[in-house]
Structures are given as C-alpha cells and as structure tokens.
A protein has these predicted regions:
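Short, Lys/Arg- and Gly-enriched loop/turn segments at beta-strand edges
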Residues: 60-68
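Short nucleic-acid-contacting surface segments enriched for D/E, G, S/T with interspersed K/R
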Residues: 41-56
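Short, isolated positions in well-ordered beta-strands
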Residues: 35-36, 71
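Short peripheral tails and domain-boundary helices/loops at the edges of structured domains
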Residues: 67-79
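Short capping micro-motif at the N-terminus of alpha-helices
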Residues: 38-39, 75
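Structural detector for short beta-strands of small beta-barrel domains
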Residues: 5-22
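Short, basic/aromatic beta-hairpin or loop at an interaction surface
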Residues: 19-35
C-alpha cells in the first residue's frame, strides 16, 4: 500500500445506493458491480447517497476511502 501524503493515482468509483460509513463487515457495493467488505475495525458514521470512493487495491485486497470521510479502511473483494 502507498504512503499517505504522496501524490498517487487511485481508482475512483461510486457506491451504489446509500452508505452509513465504516464498520467491521460493512459491504460496499459499487456501481461497477464490484462488492468489497471492510476487514478493519475502523468505525465512522456518515450517511451519504452514492458517494464517490477512492480505491487502492492489489488483487482482492486493499484500502478504500469514502468521499468526505476521514480515514482509509482495509477491504477485501467478495464479488
């Protein structure tokens, strides 16, 4: 994974429907058909409808950050 603060290119996607933010086991369904599940225990609530997300992934694991949220969370791809 990349270091914070460095200018990097991330994949930009959009969550399908609404989300309430982060929590262990939360599933993020993207408009591109992919589904990712949060594997870290970070907990942050922010209800949003179809927010943009940044993805930093390698294969079926990586990190995700929802627009307007503070942190990146660890994820695994389940679909």
């Amino acid at each position: 994974f990349r270091m914070k603060g460095l200018p990097m290119e991330y994949d930009k996607e959009t969550i399908k429907g609404s989300t309430n933010g982060y929590g262990l086991g939360v599933k993020f369904e993207l408009t591109n058909g992919q589904v990712w599940e949060q594997t870290s225990s970070d907990d942050e609530y922010l209800h949003q409808f179809m927010p943009e997300v940044l993805l930093d992934t390698a294969g079926n694991i990586g990190k995700l950050k929802i627009n307007d949220m503070n942190d990146w969370v660890e994820i695994k791809r389940i679909l």
